[in-house]
């Protein structure tokens, strides 16, 4: 800058400069009489900054020190935000997770739900009590008859009726078959997500046999609409109880094969032990139920504590975990399958003869044979299936021990043939709320294992 100032003081051709590398002073010769422009002090100050066209913002910029002594400024490192699902095969339906990752460590896990919302609770308000029943098959579409059982018990409580003993035993029988269906799906797809393919193929063969039992008793493989207010739709066909007995006799061997594949498998233990730990306190605070609660060491099973139908007449044990991790919950589900086999065999041995519907013509439709001969029965059938039956005003909360946890139905009647309000309490909703707590600090791959152990189905979460 000092050299520029000295240069600007010189005028005209008398200005002389030193050519680099030579000691000879040469006069500056203006070309064709034109005066040669030289940068002055103002120009150098204006354009000598950080940018070519400075502004107020750039005026405050200071050049960094050109050495390695001064430490660089601390910079903020932001975590990676990742979308998991909803099209991911391990998302078990339409789960979308917005995860915050630090490297491969999960810092935050935010579930976004509602992608399978169908407005079930509102639709039920526009249907009769019988027409509302099939909606429950489509909530937790892996354990269909358990959902029907909860709704039927709620309607029966409002009607103040009790189904005959045979109907109650059939309900318990198929409730435990449904529990087997659900736990096979839960355990094998959990293993499939982690990378064990064999149990999935082995156990789904058994699952197919149980779907055949569904089909023989109701005509449908999945959405049965078999358990109805007042009893069940129709009696067991001939030979079905023998086939269920043969199935249950051999099914414990299939469970042994499943445990042989997984229980002491080194890779399975590495992927599940100490993953997704839930303490007993957290399980209660989050409102967990079912295996998610029992895996943490709390022995709570509505079939024992608040028995419904004929669960007070069957003997079974309630398995609980000790650590509250994925491995304990897996062991609980496997043991529950063994206990379900015990209950099924007791149901087959204690199945009484008799009616399968309540003896109340205002609730139960007449038999097909009567409709063919009696005009009054035909009219009665028509009125029941078009207008439905009136339910006395009242409200009830009825809960059962569904395979995933406590499935509750809060039913309000205003005295008409349609429910005034039907609120459904799904166990998977509370479990999904605890996903952030369970997955924090784990690796990204462990989130898949945690979703699998929660046994989430989005039909009931989104409703």
UniProtKB/Swiss-Prot annotation:
Residues 1-33 form a transit peptide. The lineage of its organism: Eukaryota, Metazoa, Chordata, Craniata, Vertebrata. Its cofactor is [4Fe-4S] cluster. One of its GO terms (biological process) is gliogenesis. Keywords: 4Fe-4S, Acetylation, Electron transport, Iron, Iron-sulfur, Membrane, Metal-binding, Methylation, Mitochondrion, Mitochondrion inner membrane, NAD, Oxidoreductase, Respiratory chain, Transit peptide, Translocase, Transport, Ubiquinone. The keyword Transcription regulation does not apply. The modification N6-acetyllysine is found at residue 62. This is NADH dehydrogenase [ubiquinone] iron-sulfur protein 2, mitochondrial. Core subunit of the mitochondrial membrane respiratory chain NADH dehydrogenase (Complex I) which catalyzes electron transfer from NADH through the respiratory chain, using ubiquinone as an electron acceptor. Essential for the catalytic activity and assembly of complex I. Redox-sensitive, critical component of the oxygen-sensing pathway in the pulmonary vasculature which plays a key role in acute pulmonary oxygen-sensing and hypoxic pulmonary vasoconstriction. Plays an important role in carotid body sensing of hypoxia. PROSITE patterns: COMPLEX1_49K. GO terms for molecular function: 4 iron, 4 sulfur cluster binding; metal ion binding; NAD binding; NADH dehydrogenase (ubiquinone) activity; oxygen sensor activity; quinone binding. Pfam families: Complex1_49kDa (PF00346). [4Fe-4S] cluster binds at residues 326, 332, 347. The modification Symmetric dimethylarginine is found at residue 118. Its main location: mitochondrion. HAMAP family: NDH1_NuoD. Binds 1 [4Fe-4S] cluster. Dimethylation at Arg-118 by NDUFAF7 takes place after NDUFS2 assembles into the complex I, leading to stabilize the early intermediate complex. GO terms for cellular component: mitochondrial inner membrane; mitochondrion; respiratory chain complex I. It is an enzyme of class 7 (translocase). Core subunit of respiratory chain NADH dehydrogenase (Complex I) which is composed of 45 different subunits. Component of the iron-sulfur (IP) fragment of the enzyme. Interacts with NDUFAF3. Interacts with NDUFAF7. Interacts with CERS2. It is found in: Mitochondrion inner membrane. NCBIfam families: NuoD, PRK06075.1. It catalyses: a ubiquinone + NADH + 5 H(+)(in) = a ubiquinol + NAD(+) + 4 H(+)(out).
